Amino acid sequence: MTLLNRLFIFPLYYNGNTKFMPIHCSDLTEIIYQVISKNIVSHTIECVGPETISLKDILKRLLKITEKNRILIPLPLFLAKLSAVFFQLLPNPLLTLDQLRLLKYNNVASGKYKTNVDIGIPSICKFDEEVEKYAFMWKERGQFSRKRNEI
């Protein structure tokens, strides 16, 4: 969110095609609890959220929920690397080369192992619904951006 707040034009690394299966921390803790209580510790389990979303879709959803207008523009790889090298020089880098390398690969279930859904513990929390709960922090009027009937 820091970059989305600071930049009017937002770079899309790898064209924003990197896929994610975001999982909410409450879903993850429930999975851990169930795995321990049911003694399912002999398996590798990939914990995934209920939906697969591209980086570009995540950014579009964040912008819509936070009521911001930004231009999303694909950034050529050499410029992305150059910006990551520059950002790494800052005390609190907004992007590092390692983060850029990670964006090259999808972060979804590999298919090699069972997922939480396969063992009967599906994720419940949806991305948009959870982000909406905290989005007021990034809206122009902060907590006062909520509609009166929501309070």
Whereabouts are the PLM-identified features?
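Low-complexity, charge- and small-residue-enriched intrinsically disordered regions
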Residues: 9-13, 17-25, 87-111
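Mid/C-terminal beta-alpha module of Rossmann-like enzyme folds, strongest
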Residues: 35-96, 111-151
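Short, hinge-like loop/turn segments at secondary-structure boundaries
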Residues: 1-4, 89-91
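A conserved pocket-lining segment of Rossmann-fold NAD(P)-dependent short-chain dehydrogenase/reductase
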Residues: 2-23, 31-48
